[in-house]
């Protein structure tokens, strides 16, 4: 049986029990090293007290950072039991020095907590092309201290960069708990995973099963979100299962894991840089899931659609434009297509007159979650994607990012 322990609304206001139990056997560390402004933690780490099964996916960017390189090597050697994250510096495009620095940091932390470096994957997020301030980091790590039982909200806050709120979701599956955290509000259209997302569970899940389930869930969630079409150099998503609570049915575990990751994806999209609205687009009647995703991504990535939604302007013809751009999908026939905003039909016709249709659509666009539903009328496959509106604030944030 799957139960919701903690979830968040699309704009981050949390409901349910903020002190919900965390999975057994995980400890965390959070501290301020000096990468971020004073008063904000910029270092975080979560480690299982016992060996884990784990599954990790990484960015496909050609400019993947040294932390991705280190972590890929580690998972070839062992099954990691934890993750450390530095925020406000991506350590990307930093060459051999950047790789040496990342290795030194991971080795130093591993010595402090008494594990092998390969037992930790490492992630880093922030400005590209800047070396770590190693003297500052070394001084900060000297006072790392003892870990505490996992506090997902503290870790989620420590990995934030331009995020405006922490992103945490939890589910209970039988006697086990799944908790997930994520960060990322810009440079987001993953091609494998997400910005940064880490899931911890005390369920006992065999390695092969965990790999299969996690990759399927990643495809349906993180690979189905886009804020600005840009794929990060540091994307990493991972799940760690330490088995402390015993086994759970595969189907229930997969359902709960997908619910956690879907919560996180919605939080990411609704917290997109400058965003005021979450866009959920469902494409049905496609000849394949791939086709449905292509059409859905074309809609949520269209600047004209995104600005239309931000301005609450019921110019639904822009959705047709975005579908029409998918010219490689040769079996799409415009005469078969149906488009609706939530349950409000707009194409090819509405039961309302034109004026009433416009006003009802305008009312829907005024909500914080905008639903666009497209039926291609070809086949039986469906896909759902998540995005956000495009605002002046997005431009301001990214025009001034390093200044």
UniProtKB/Swiss-Prot annotation:
Active site: 194
Pathway stated in the Swiss-Prot or TrEMBL entry: Amino-acid biosynthesis; L-arginine biosynthesis; L-ornithine and N-acetyl-L-glutamate from L-glutamate and N(2)-acetyl-L-ornithine (cyclic): step 1/1; Amino-acid biosynthesis; L-arginine biosynthesis; N(2)-acetyl-L-ornithine from L-glutamate: step 1/4
UniProt cross-references to InterPro entries, sorted A to Z: Arg_biosynth_ArgJ, ArgJ-like_dom_sf, ArgJ_beta_C
Zinc-finger found in the keyword field: no
Reaction(s) the record says it catalyses: N(2)-acetyl-L-ornithine + L-glutamate = N-acetyl-L-glutamate + L-ornithine; L-glutamate + acetyl-CoA = N-acetyl-L-glutamate + CoA + H(+)
Region (Disordered): 1-21
Feature: compositional bias, Polar residues: 1-11
Gene Ontology terms for molecular function: glutamate N-acetyltransferase activity; L-glutamate N-acetyltransferase activity
GO cellular component: cytoplasm
Cellular compartments annotated: Cytoplasm
Positions contributing to substrate binding: 161, 183, 194, 273, 398, 403
Residues annotated as site: Involved in the stabilization of negative charge on the oxyanion by the formation of the oxyanion hole: 125-126
Function: Catalyzes two activities which are involved in the cyclic version of arginine biosynthesis: the synthesis of N-acetylglutamate from glutamate and acetyl-CoA as the acetyl donor, and of ornithine by transacetylation between N(2)-acetylornithine and glutamate.
Self-association state and partner proteins as the record states: Heterotetramer of two alpha and two beta chains.
Record's protein name: Arginine biosynthesis bifunctional protein ArgJ
Organism of origin: Rhodococcoides fascians
Lineage: Bacteria, Bacillati, Actinomycetota, Actinomycetes, Mycobacteriales
Gene name per UniProt: argJ
């Amino acid at each position: 049986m799957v139960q919701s322990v903690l979830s968040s609304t699309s704009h981050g206001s949390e409901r349910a029990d903020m002190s919900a139990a965390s999975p057994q056997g995980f400890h965390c560390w959070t501290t301020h090293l000096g990468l971020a402004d004073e008063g904000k933690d910029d270092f975080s780490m979560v480690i299982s007290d016992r060996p884990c099964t784990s599954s990790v996916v990484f960015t496909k960017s050609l400019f993947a950072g040294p932390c991705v390189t280190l972590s890929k090597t580690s998972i070839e050697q062992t099954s990691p039991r934890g993750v450390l994250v530095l925020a406000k510096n991506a350590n990307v495009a930093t060459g051999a020095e950047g790789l040496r620095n990342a290795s030194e940091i991971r080795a130093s932390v591993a010595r402090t907590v008494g594990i092998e470096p390969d037992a930790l994957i490492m992630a880093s997020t922030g400005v590209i092309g800047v070396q770590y301030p190693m003297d500052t980091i070394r001084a900060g790590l000297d006072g790392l201290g003892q870990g505490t039982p996992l506090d997902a909200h503290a870790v989620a806050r420590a990995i934030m960069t331009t995020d405006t709120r922490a992103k945490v979701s939890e589910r209970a599956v039988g006697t086990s708990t799944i908790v997930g955290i994520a960060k990322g509000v810009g440079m987001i259209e993953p091609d494998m995973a997400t910005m940064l997302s880490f899931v911890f569970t005390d369920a006992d899940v065999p390695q092969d099963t965990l790999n299969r389930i996690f990759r399927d869930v990643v495809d349906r969630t993180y690979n189905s979100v886009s804020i600005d079409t840009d794929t990060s150099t540091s994307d990493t998503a991972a799940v760690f299962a330490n088995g402390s609570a015993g086994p759970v049915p595969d189907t229930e575990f997969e359902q709960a894991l997908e619910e956690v990751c879907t919560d996180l994806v919605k939080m990411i999209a609704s917290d997109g840089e400058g965003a005021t609205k979450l866009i959920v687009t469902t494409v049905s009647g496609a000849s394949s899931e791939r086709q449905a995703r292509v059409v859905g991504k074309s809609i949520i990535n269209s600047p004209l659609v995104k600005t239309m939604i931000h301005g609450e302007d019921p110019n639904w013809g822009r959705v047709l434009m975005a579908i029409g751009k998918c010219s490689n999908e040769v079996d799409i026939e415009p005469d078969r297509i149906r488009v609706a905003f939530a349950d409000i039909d707009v194409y090819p016709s509405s039961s309302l007159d034109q004026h009433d249709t416009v006003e009802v659509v305008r009312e829907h666009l005024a909500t914080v979650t905008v639903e666009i539903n497209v039926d291609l009328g070809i086949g039986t496959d469906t896909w759902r994607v998540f995005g956000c509106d495009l605002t002046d604030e997005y431009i301001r944030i990214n025009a001034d990012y390093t200044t």
